[in-house]
Regions:
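A short, surface-exposed loop/turn module that caps and links secondary-structure elements
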Residues: 35-62
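Enriched for short, Lys/Arg-rich terminal
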Residues: 1-4, 10-28, 32, 59-89
């Protein structure tokens, strides 16, 4: 099953900030993460961490030491909603 990826306003701003940083390794890793999320959002080559203190299941994957990709899976719509991609939670 292929999941559709959607982005929150904050995630779009975060991705733009990462692009402006010019860090090619971060952008390459981010692109790889998006491909993995489409195929298997619950597992992957990077460690998937379930975040606490959220009412809805919210997951995170490491982009690099500084940044995390935070997302939710909407099974009823076969969608992954990316919440943020800049900073550490």
């Amino acid at each position: 099953m292929i999941y559709q990826i959607k982005f929150s306003e904050e995630a779009l701003k975060d991705i733009e900030r990462l692009k402006e940083s010019g860090n090619k390794s971060v952008l390459k890793k981010l692109a790889k993460l998006f491909l993995e999320l489409q195929e298997h959002p619950y597992t992957g080559t990077m460690q998937v961490e379930q975040l606490k203190h959220y009412e809805v299941q919210t997951l995170s994957r490491r982009i690099n030491r500084e940044h995390r990709l935070v997302y939710r899976i909407q099974e009823q719509f076969v969608t992954v909603l990316v919440l943020s991609a800049f900073g550490y939670y």
